[in-house]
Amino acid sequence: MIINAKGPASFAEKYIVRSIWDNKFPPGSILPAERELSELIGVTRTTLREVLQRLARDGWLKIQHGKPTRVNNFWETSGLNILETIADLNPEGFPVLVDQLLSARTNVSAIYFRGALRYNPDTAVDVLAKIHQLEDTAESYAEFDYLLHHTLAFSSGNPLYVLILNGFKGLYSRVGRYYFTSSDARLLALNFYKELELLAQVKNYLDVPALMRTYGMNSGKMWLQLRDDMPASIAQDN
């Protein structure tokens, strides 16, 4: 097992997570005793204890006082905060993970975009006005796209959507910077932003879902043209 880590705690965390992913420590199994595991990994018991607590908070493990530590089925117990970890664990499956991420975001964003234009159309108008000074670069488009989603999610009347976005901010930002290297992708997005701005200006929230569906389909097709050339390094949070 080859693990790149910045220190003992990082190494221990990656070792345990990799072992869970590879079924060396399968769901429902009991982790080795603390002393045995610390010797196996090569870290102090204090460091290991801190790592185990962190992994328990992320849903990988179940720690109960006086009982051995049990491995969870992380698909059932973890949240969006482990997306970065999954991308790192399974680089071959990363394109599929991105497909699923974009599909989920498209479905959810249709809800909070509509909510924002319904409850806070002036906020939507203000943020969309920035498109008229938007630089024609991948970095600028990726930053604006996230800003737009974050602003409208917060203005939708349900701030929980912001927490969902925060869960995959790093991963989505890296993918966005790659996606928007395509001038066609930038033009597609710009036309979408302009149409959304027109709806916001007249407070027409009813037509938002149809606009989102159309853009979702078109951007999805664009993504399929780009995904096979995506650098593997995007999967890693450097």
From Swiss-Prot:
> Residues of the signal sequence?
none
SUPFAM superfamilies, sorted: GntR ligand-binding domain-like, Winged helix' DNA-binding domain
Residues annotated as domain HTH gntR-type: 6-74
Check the record and name the SMART domains matching this protein: HTH_GNTR
Gene Ontology CC terms, in alphabetical order? cytoplasm
Q: Which GO molecular function annotation, any one, does this entry have?
A: DNA binding
Q: What is this protein called?
A: Fatty acid metabolism regulator protein
Q: Which organism is it from?
A: Shewanella baltica (strain OS223)
Q: What is the lineage of its organism?
A: Bacteria, Pseudomonadati, Pseudomonadota, Gammaproteobacteria, Alteromonadales
